[in-house]
């Protein structure tokens, strides 16, 4: 088994969540890799790196899936990516602090597909609420639970 590492699906990850991750990587001396199709601002650190992938549908997701290992954590709001990560034995956590598991991922995929069908038929479903202080705290708490094991 490889070493612990955190991967971030960084194009859509909110900045306050990235800040929490930057602090955690420094505190725990833990590799943190942000994957995006654009250059990101990351603090200078031997633990924090970024991978810039080409633009295109799910290119960053595929990079993460190709490199993730069972000891890794992936931060993503992308449910299909979370499903692939879980299939590889790793953990996936969304930016609101919800851990995707083998028990809940099928339901999440079904709901995502249902909402996508509604949108494609012209129904306006709205987007997610803005990230709240409670969401940030929930994320930090869930991350800390994982970090305790590292």
From Swiss-Prot:
Protein's organism: Shewanella sp. (strain MR-4)
Member of which family? Belongs to the UPF0178 family.
Record InterPro entries: UPF0178
Pfam name, any one: DUF188
Q: NCBIfam families given for it?
A: PRK00124.1
Lineage, top-rank taxon, reads Bacteria
- The protein depicted here goes by the name UPF0178 protein Shewmr4_1560
């Amino acid at each position: 088994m490889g070493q612990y590492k955190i991967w971030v699906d960084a194009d859509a990850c909110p900045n306050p969540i990235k800040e929490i991750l930057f602090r955690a990587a420094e505190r725990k001396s833990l590799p943190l890799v942000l994957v995006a199709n654009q250059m990101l601002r990351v603090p200078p650190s031997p633990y924090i790196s970024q991978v810039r992938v080409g633009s295109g549908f799910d290119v960053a997701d595929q990079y993460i899936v190709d490199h993730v290992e069972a000891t890794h954590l992936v931060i993503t709001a992308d449910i299909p990516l979370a499903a692939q990560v879980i299939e590889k034995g790793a953990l996936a956590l969304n930016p609101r602090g919800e851990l995707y598991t083998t028990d809940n991922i099928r339901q999440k995929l079904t709901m995502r597909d249902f909402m996508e069908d509604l949108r494609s038929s012209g129904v306006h479903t709205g987007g997610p609420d803005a990230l709240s202080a409670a969401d940030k705290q929930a994320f930090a708490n869930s991350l800390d639970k994982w970090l305790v094991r590292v």
